Amino acid sequence: MRLGHISDFHLRYHLAGTSTVLARKSRDMPEKINLAIKRFREEKVDCVVVTGDIVDHPFEDMNIPEYLEKGEADLLLVRDLLDQLDCPVFVVYGNHDHPLLFRRVFSLREESSIVGDFRIHCFYDEEGRNNTPERVGGELERFFEATSNSDEYSQIHIQHYLLYPEKNDGYPHTYLNSTSLIKSASSFGKVTLALSGHFHPGENLVQYQGIYFAVAPAFCEPPHPFRIYDLSRPIIQTQHLNLS
């Protein structure tokens, strides 16, 4: 199976302005996303994963009517772009997305999906105290249920935040309970690959406790990188792509 991975658009088109971080080219995103989708189609990937921060929704006064209307319009724009793909697309929200608007536009994949030889699980987590992400409640229950599944499918787990490695200097990117999550996942041996975004420099594919972990670099920042993973071999291969 060939899996496309792209993350952190921080798009603004209907929403005014741009990200407060000038390196994030929020207003260029519709054109750039379209180019990445074209490449995914050319590469004939079997599915595409988008690991959050679809839109750069304003944090302050995030629920005022104007921001809600334009934020939803921007999510719809991204959905329309992704609809050009002729393969399954898995999207989770990030800390810069409005969770309720995301649910309205994309809905949540709370049931797993099978693509090829893999069962794909999406997890929708939140930041907690001091902006530290944590998997709790229903998402934690779904995680434990997934990792203890005894069927024949290997699993791919999709989330915005990092399970591994620990990247918390300057800003907390890694789950507060990452150690226990990895321990649970590795003990049952069901999880082959865990994909994340959030940490803009990204992290290359690495194997730890029997699981492959990868963090996509932010697509919103030049050279607008994205990846394709080839899972057809025992050792997963990464193809690094960008728009430069």
Language-model segments: residues:
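Divalent metal-coordination and catalytic microenvironments
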Residues: 8, 48, 53, 94, ...
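His/acidic metal-ligating clusters that form di-metal
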Residues: 36-48, 119, 132-212
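Short, flexible/disordered intra-domain loops and linkers
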Residues: 17-26, 60-71, 167-173
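Acidic, histidine-bearing metal-coordination/catalytic regions of metal-dependent phosphoesterases
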Residues: 1-47, 76, 85, 232-244
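Beta-strand-turn-beta hairpins that frame and shape the catalytic cleft
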Residues: 1-5, 13-16, 112-122, 150-156, ...
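Active-site environment of divalent metal-dependent phosphoester hydrolases
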Residues: 10-17, 56-59, 95-102, 128-131, ...
